[in-house]
Amino acid sequence: MAKVNLIESPYSLLQLKGIGPKKIEVLQQLNIHTVEDLVLYLPTRYEDNTVIDLNQAEDQSNVTIEGQVYTAPVVAFFGRNKSKLTVHLMVNNIAVKCIFFNQPYLKKKIELNQTITVKGKWNRVKQEITGNRVFFNSQGTQTQENADVQLEPVYRIKEGIKQKQIRDQIRQALNDVTIHEWLTDELREKYKLETLDFTLNTLHHPKSKEDLLRARRTYAFTELFLFELRMQWLNRLEKSSDEAIEIDYDIDQVKSFIDRLPFELTEAQKSSVNEIFRDLKAPIRMHRLLQGDVGSGKTVVAAICMYALKTAGYQSALMVPTEILAEQHAESLMALFGDSMNVALLTGSVKGKKRKILLEQLENGTIDCLIGTHALIQDDVIFHNVGLVITDEQHRFGVNQRQLLREKGAMTNVLFMTATPIPRTLAISVFGEMDVSSIKQLPKGRKPIITTWAKHEQYDKVLMQMTSELKKGRQAYVICPLIESSEHLEDVQNVVALYESLQQYYGVSRVGLLHGKLSADEKDEVMQKFSNHEINVLVSTTVVEVGVNVPNATFMMIYDADRFGLSTLHQLRGRVGRSDQQSYCVLIASPKTETGIERMTIMTQTTDGFELSERDLEMRGPGDFFGVKQSGLPDFLVANLVEDYRMLEVARDEAAELIQSGVFFENTYQHLRHFVEENLLHRSFD
């Protein structure tokens, strides 16, 4: 089937006035290949050229004024090819001096008694405006050239095309295209939305702020609705082929295992286990996200599920993003299972004969549980009968990597885990097809981490506080943003310099260094020494952000903390507070921006990862929250997942109703269905 367009044009781009082969090349650099692409190339922002009352204008602000010329323009030249044009306007009985630099040609355009509109910076004291643009009115009415003066669209452009040119070309295209409605009359009426014709014309050429808001709302809903149609359709397709073998686990053995644990499960952990067990008994594959704050006990929940699979005769796999984390998981699971399960570790460091034996044991079923990095998805890793695949910190893996692991078994159940609590808005979008279990309770006996913020000049005082903890027999982390010094970031501390400084302060043998450039063996050696209390202070980059578990560590210093986002800071902070001892986190930062100050303030106010994730999303946006490529999110042109989260929920409900009821597959939705199928359904946003 040919590509289905919802916007159709009788012309190609080359047939539009003003577009030749050179312009085509520039447009293609902007990813504009067809007239449809041009019409959907929306402005990134709007210049508000609304004429302002000078009595209300703030000093040194950018304003737009309209007045009558009462002195002839005068041009003075100075320097090398520089000029200054001066003209006086009467603006509502206020005499205003207008200055235009390096625009001498305006002298021929500006006439006495002419009404003009000027945009520029206002000097209230001098009653003077430094103009950067002027619009000419013809006998008191706006010319076509100035038709967009009030709300002027601004597009992302490249060298070879000007704003006015792309505006004119879009105006041409809109006059000739046929626009098929993307939403039904029923939906538009239900949510008071506009037609797509009105919406696109208004987004490109708004006549008022009110019209622009209505158009933006309609287009945002449309984007979210199309995205959710895709998500719901994929979900339907996946479930239709998601037949699974019921996992007939031995509940008595599972209960006995839980009773033998050296601690009592929290209610949140029990609830999550029950939700997962219900999925395992269902006739379709499990797709569940288990999210919990740092230290909330997700690994124990995973362990119980793995044990259940073992009692049913199935293997389990756990894939994590780093070797350090894989080793820690393997160590903790071996301790939990004892002799009841055969746990193996597979990373890139496992080679030769050891790897060969491990793979043989995996294929013949001797290994019950395999833990590892992306090494698990290699072709020669063959399971005997894997029934459960768990991916930890799943947003750090691409969709393809996660899918390859899942395909290791014919009817494998899938559990994703994350210690980065997903904001509700992103959970709906990225994991809309999954069920979500959340652990918001910390294990009994844990004390909230005391977080404080200190300026750089207070470093010595922080060092004394850390020394006090070390004297109690505790351990500490010191985190830096850089491995080595950078000429571009001279004011940012680097981990090597701080490591050497602390070695002089505490002694060489008491301080360890960890960063991403070390080999796997070197990292293992350092972590082993820290875990065994051979090292008191670990100086590190964010390589310790996830999973590292040393209960005796009770102090964390994060240097240049304003260089990190809220979620990263919270993950780092979660490396302490993993015992019943009081833990401390000190943020050393002298932020120069409002955002940096806000992050430091928020971190000292709450230790709730779910609250922090929402604030982080608000501050950074969805693309930066996960990293654009890993988020699974499309680049919405108008919709904003933070501002439009209620709209997202409505769009999801409407899409789910259409797909699940089967109405979407009737003739009424034929055009829209073909569009989603041909343009969106199998598109990867990864």
Curated annotation (Swiss-Prot):
InterPro entries: ATP-dep_DNA_helicase_RecG (IPR004609), DEAD/DEAH_box_helicase_dom (IPR011545), Helicase_ATP-bd (IPR014001), Helicase_C-like (IPR001650), NA-bd_OB-fold (IPR012340), P-loop_NTPase (IPR027417), RecG/Mfd (IPR047112), RecG_dom3_C (IPR045562)
Enzyme Commission no: 5.6.2.4
Intrachain S-S bonds: none
One Gene Ontology molecular-function label: DNA helicase activity
Subunit structure: Monomer.
Family recorded in the similarity comment: Belongs to the helicase family. RecG subfamily.
Protein name per its UniProtKB record: ATP-dependent DNA helicase RecG
Lineage summary: Bacteria, Bacillati, Bacillota, Bacilli, Bacillales
Ligand binding (ATP): 292-299
GO biological process terms held by the UniProt record: DNA recombination; DNA repair
Motif (DEAH box): 392-395
Entry comment, domain topic: The wedge domain within the N-terminus inserts into the replication fork junction, where the lagging and leading strand split.
Domain Helicase ATP-binding: residue ranges: 279-439
Primary gene name: recG
Function: Plays a critical role in recombination and DNA repair. Helps process Holliday junction intermediates to mature products by catalyzing branch migration. Has replication fork regression activity, unwinds stalled or blocked replication forks to make a HJ that can be resolved. Has a DNA unwinding activity characteristic of a DNA helicase with 3'-5' polarity.
Domain (Helicase C-terminal) ranges: 462-618
Disruption phenotype: Increased sensitivity to ciproxoflacin.
Reactions catalysed according to its record: Couples ATP hydrolysis with the unwinding of duplex DNA by translocating in the 3'-5' direction; ATP + H2O = ADP + phosphate + H(+)
Pfam families for this protein: DEAD, Helicase_C, RecG_dom3_C, RecG_wedge
Entry keyword set: ATP-binding, DNA damage, DNA recombination, DNA repair, DNA-binding, Helicase, Hydrolase, Isomerase, Nucleotide-binding
Region span, Wedge domain: 50-149
Record keyword Isomerase present: yes
